[in-house]
Amino acid sequence: MTKKQIREGIGLTALNIFFIVLCFVTLIPILYAVSVSLSGQNSLLSSDFSFIPKDFTLDNYKKVIFGEDILTWFKNTVFLAVVTVSLSLLIAVPAAYCFSRRRFPGRKPILKCLVLLNSFPAILSMFAIYRLLRPMGLVNHRVGLILVYTGTMAVFSLWNTKGYFDTIPTEIEEAAKIDGASDIQVVTKIVMPLAKPSIITTALQVLIYVWNEYIYATTFMTGESKYTLAAGLNSLQATEMTGSWPVFAAASITVSIPVLIIFFKCQKYMTSGLTAGGVKG
């Protein structure tokens, strides 16, 4: 081996060690939450920091799994997530294909305007959205929250899928039309299968947003039976679970598991779906 190869090998090894340590550091809060959730001691911060629970118990998870409130909030969140993902993709995918393949007056200004509107933080539009939803009776109603979520994520979905459509060569569609395929057949049998990584990635991003969203959920949902998981966990932490951090930690870990499972199942689509959409978008 040459000196250059040795230096490159040492540098690559050092870089790998650095990223391993960095990953471990970022996992410390999660590992500590897992440790607290498995502990029978009711203490969150103590001088004897340890990742291994001293009084190991699964009672905290039993209280969470068999609690009626958690199940209700879980159902609410799943319903909101499924409907929001479906509506966002139903709106964004056709619009993204149109913006990618068609050239019409005002195309670029519309895209820039959508990005500008979506760049403001959610809290700035909170009062305006509340004033719009209240006269329609959509405050403390799941339909109102679905409209807010869909309007928020449809823009992101449009941009991400449009970027991926831009990477699909138009020659493929032209060749299919020469072979006698109609416009609908080109879209459904050629373009959509090729855009599958981007669509799945976009759907996953919308799902994660709805699952973790807190500001809108706590503002527009005032009834405890209509809380999402994020709003419900906050209400529990602020009330009866204030003195039971292990149960709260167990609840936090439990509600994260479904999204983690879906994420790992769809992980193979994430790289191509995000990078291609980000580069061309």
Describe the role of every protein-language-model region:
Residues K3-G281:
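A structural signal for multi-pass alpha-helical bundles of membrane permease subunits
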